[in-house]
């Protein structure tokens, strides 16, 4: 059963009288339906009295074997309410039919076999018979004859019955009624009880309390089963198991979970189950890295052709450690001035503090005469925005929740370690793989250590994602990163950049004035919770913005399993984000070409001083 929150609750399933299928033979009403029995009382638990029970046969004419009496001392406990009822002897005989001679059912007696494996999903209960007890009344010479017949049948049962029929039961099994079994002929009774309890046997388990039943109700179901056991020989154990058969082939726990997930997937066929688990850690343990000199080519095989990115600092490509074969990402930083090395040392110091699976991990740092190379965890999924604009990807609001929650987890850890990223943007959020929803934050080149008691100001970043305090060159705090998170969330939901202008000046003016709004068309399918989440981040006043911890407690980022069932509408942001990425690429190419042309003109005129060269 799937709860409201989507969990599969597994539990022992009671087999009530109303839920049990009818007998296979004739599909007619069962014997228990034809002859309803009165509710059992405390008197039913005492040995029967021929005078009090007019329906009991005369012991002199139809004596019961003493072996049919159950030893109360060996009984594990009263019957659980709703447990399956005992099977008839006719369904378990060596040839598939009951013994007409009145012997007990096949496998109904004998020493118990080895305990079944813990993974067994059905358990057999062998109800021990005490040969010292006998029914009331004078048995005479018939007692010895019946006892011999019972012994022969028990021996036949041990030879021909399956192994699991002899396995001992857990204490939660059905206990036999103390009432005499002379209501039906001996050939139609059995002492085997199978239960569908899929738990490991525990001798300390009392059993009946868990089922919530009473001894009286349990005895009533036993009495009804004994009356109907004569028709059980034609029943099938699997599929249409009738109520006379006390064996239920309960599937294993893993199968039940799989079936529940399949059912959920069928009910919500338009929703794909999200892998909202935390991403796996780096393929190497967290380490404290120190910048050292060395020969890069002797330790690593650089693959400069497989470029992963680049910028003002240099380029990023893949590489392989020769000693271990570990694939890594190599960030090659040009060392032109002493400040360049100082910035790299600060980046190494920051990354040494960040041991979190939503944050990229540093492996090694090597300095050469002209470069500093940082070897980091390789993340193969690519940029988040590149991933979600794929035509085969179905972006929903729930996907956005999963992405944003992981980003918040990484930011929260950074802030607890007194680190500010200060350059959160879509390019710095990578997917772990090309198919899942797991992301990691990268690029700590602009990150700073943060002390709330000290004033910290910065004047760098990407204009679209800068906060008002950075543009104004005011004191920053951990809330500065939260503004950038609000911009990223806005873009994931709508595909639009809230402050993007025709140029950087217009963009910065929009940021300073906090001039933004929810576009009616693009936010048509977005929930009010998502809008409230963004509104509490894109606030000019730092103190009014949510922290990372408050974001994780926001209603929008919680109860994802429940929201996934009803929030399956595809967002329009996919199409708009694709246009945004195309425009971003065009802008980068335009700037690069313009800079190259300008440099060519200036160099030809000999006025390099205009560029500060």
From Swiss-Prot:
Residues forming coiled coils: none
Bias type Pro residues, positions: 56-66
Gene3D superfamilies (UniProt xref): Phosphorylase Kinase, domain 1, Transferase(Phosphotransferase) domain 1
Active site: 423 (proton acceptor)
A biological-process GO annotation: striated muscle contraction
Keywords linked to the UniProt accession: ATP-binding, Calmodulin-binding, Cytoplasm, Kinase, Nucleotide-binding, Phosphoprotein, Serine/threonine-protein kinase, Transferase
Biased composition (Gly residues): 95-105
Feature: compositional bias, Basic and acidic residues: 32-55, 67-83, 145-158
Localization, UniProt: Cytoplasm
GO CC terms, sorted: cytoplasm; nucleus; synapse
Binding site for ATP: 308-316, 331
GO MF annotation list: ATP binding; calmodulin binding; myosin light chain kinase activity
Entry EC no(s): 2.7.11.18
Comp. bias intervals (Polar residues): 1-20
Claim: Phosphoprotein is one of the keywords in the record: yes
Residues modified as Phosphothreonine: 462
Residue numbers spanned by region Disordered: 1-168, 219-240
Residue ranges occupied by any Protein kinase domain in the UniProt entry: 302-557
InterPro entries according to UniProt: Kinase-like_dom_sf, MLCK2_STKc, Prot_kinase_dom, Protein_kinase_ATP_BS, Ser/Thr_kinase_AS
Family indicated by similarity: Belongs to the protein kinase superfamily. CAMK Ser/Thr protein kinase family.
Subunit-level organization: May interact with centrin.
The protein's role, per its UniProt record: Implicated in the level of global muscle contraction and cardiac function. Phosphorylates a specific serine in the N-terminus of a myosin light chain.
UniProt-recorded name of the protein: Myosin light chain kinase 2, skeletal/cardiac muscle
Organism: Mus musculus
